[in-house]
Amino acid sequence: MFEKLQDVLCYRFADVRLLETALTHSSYANERGTEIEHNERLEYLGDAVLELTVSEQLFTRFPEAREGQLTRMRARLVSKPSLAELARELKLDTYLLLGKGEESQGGRTRSSVLSDAFEAILGAIFLDGGYAAAGKTVLHVFSSRWPQGAEAARTKDAKSTLQELTQRLFKERPVYTLLGSSGPEHEKIFKVRLLLPDGRALETEGQSVKRAEQKAAGLALELLEGESA
C-alpha cells in the first residue's frame, strides 16, 4: 500500500505500521475506536526531529550567518504552509486516513492536516530507523528548498551589509584591525577589532581572519539594526 510513498521518502520501514499510524488522523481513530492509534504523538516527535535536522543543516551551510538569520531561515523552512506544500508534492493527501466528517470538510487538502502528517512521518522514521535515517529523509525532501542566491548571499556576507548600513548612517565605512592570533599553527584563532564610525568597537575571534571579521560585522549589524528597529 505504501511502496511508492516509501520510495519517495527514500526510506523503507521495518515496521510499516508506524507509517500507517503517521498517516492516521485523529478523526479516523475516533470514529473507529480507541484501539486505533492516530498521528498526534508521532507529529510531536517529528516536529522536534525536523527542527534539529534543519537547524544543524543551516548551521553547517551558512557558517557566517548570525543567530537571528538562522532562526528566520529555519522558521520559513518549517512553517506550516511550507510543510503543507512539501506534503502535497509528496502526494501525502492521497494516503491520509481521515474520518468521514473531516473528509467532508476538506481535511485532505487542509494545510494543518498535511503538515502534521509530514512531521508524523519523520517521527515514525525516527522510531523505526533512528535519527540518521530521519535526517537523511529531511535532506532528500528538502534538497531543493535550502536558501539559495540572494537569500544565501545575505547570510554569508555580513561585512558588505554592514558597510552599506554604515555608509547610509554615518557616510563612513567600518574599520577592521587584526589584533593577533593564538594557538598551534593548524588550529590558530584570530582576534579582530571592528571600529564603527561612531567610535564604538567590537572584538571577536574566529578560525580565520575572514570569519572573525564576519562575526564582528554580524554583531555590529545586530547592534545597529536593533537601535533602528
From Swiss-Prot:
PROSITE patterns in the record: DS_RBD, RNASE_3_1, RNASE_3_2
Entry's EC annotation: 3.1.26.3
Family matches, as CDD domains: DSRM_RNAse_III_family, RIBOc
GO CC terms in record: cytoplasm
SMART domains xref list: DSRM, RIBOc
Domain of life: Bacteria
Active-site residues, Swiss-Prot/TrEMBL: 47, 119
UniProt keyword list: Cytoplasm, Endonuclease, Hydrolase, Magnesium, Metal-binding, mRNA processing, Nuclease, RNA-binding, rRNA processing, rRNA-binding, tRNA processing
Subunit field text: Homodimer.
Pfam families: dsrm, Ribonucleas_3_3
Upper lineage: Bacteria, Pseudomonadati, Thermodesulfobacteriota, Desulfovibrionia, Desulfovibrionales
Cofactor(s), by name: Mg(2+)
Biological source species: Oleidesulfovibrio alaskensis (strain ATCC BAA-1058 / DSM 17464 / G20) (Desulfovibrio alaskensis)
UniProt function note: Digests double-stranded RNA. Involved in the processing of primary rRNA transcript to yield the immediate precursors to the large and small rRNAs (23S and 16S). Processes some mRNAs, and tRNAs when they are encoded in the rRNA operon. Processes pre-crRNA and tracrRNA of type II CRISPR loci if present in the organism.
The name this protein goes by in its record: Ribonuclease 3
Catalytic activity annotation: Endonucleolytic cleavage to 5'-phosphomonoester
Keyword set includes Chloroplast: no
Domain spans labelled DRBM: 157-226
Sequence ranges assigned to domain RNase III in this UniProt record: 2-130
Record: residues binding Mg(2+): 43, 116, 119
Gene name per UniProt: rnc
